[in-house]
């Protein structure tokens, strides 16, 4: 799986690369109200603020705004897991890919504009869908997912 560098509509870098969610990172993310600008250590680690976003590198996963993969890799993975209606399907796909020896590569020479809205950070139906998808993810991969 290849993922491009994502930019905000104003051209600034979007923190689109992630480390796997854990209960600790989830709690920290909730306490910071999903703000990517937070200086919270757990949130910064989850958002991979410590990596060089100009360097091609293997990563855990990236938000699913744009994935590139060969058709045979998609088939080998069985496509997207239909247990996820919305949210977490990108993290699940990348983890399954890594588990079968197919790396996820962040490729910053390819750039895309992404208007990231974080609709699930507001209390409402999408937040409940996101919570349900997280429970599905933890049930399938454990509370501290590993490659």
Named regions from a protein language model:
Residues 17-23, 122-125:
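Short, hinge-like loop/turn segments at secondary-structure boundaries
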Residues 91-147:
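Active-site-adjacent helix/loop segment of glycosyltransferases
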Residues 1-17:
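Conserved donor NDP-sugar-binding/catalytic core segment of glycosyltransferases
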Residues 16, 26, 30, 76-77, ...:
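Residues that scaffold the ATP/ADP-binding catalytic core of kinase and kinase-like folds
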Residues 52-54, 60-78, 83-111:
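A short, conserved alpha-helix in the catalytic core of glycosyltransferases
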Residues 21-59:
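Short, flexible, basic/aromatic active-site loop/helix in glycosyltransferases
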Residues 9, 23, 114-115:
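Generic structural signal for helix capping and beta-alpha/helix-loop junctions
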């Amino acid at each position: 799986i290849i993922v491009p560098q994502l930019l905000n509509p104003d051209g600034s870098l979007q923190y689109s690369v992630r480390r796997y969610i854990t209960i600790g990172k989830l709690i920290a993310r909730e306490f910071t109200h999903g703000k990517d600008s937070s200086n919270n250590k757990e949130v910064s680690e989850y958002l991979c603020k410590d990596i060089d976003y100009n360097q091609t590198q293997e990563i855990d996963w990236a938000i699913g705004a744009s994935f590139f993969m060969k058709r045979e890799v998609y088939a080998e993975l069985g496509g997207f897991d239909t247990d996820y209606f919305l949210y977490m399907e990108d993290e699940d796909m990348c983890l399954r890919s890594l588990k079968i020896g197919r790396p996820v590569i962040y490729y910053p020479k390819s750039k895309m504009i992404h208007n990231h809205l974080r609709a699930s950070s507001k209390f409402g139906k999408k937040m409940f869908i996101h919570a349900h998808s997280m429970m599905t993810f933890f049930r399938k991969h454990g509370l501290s997912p590993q490659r």
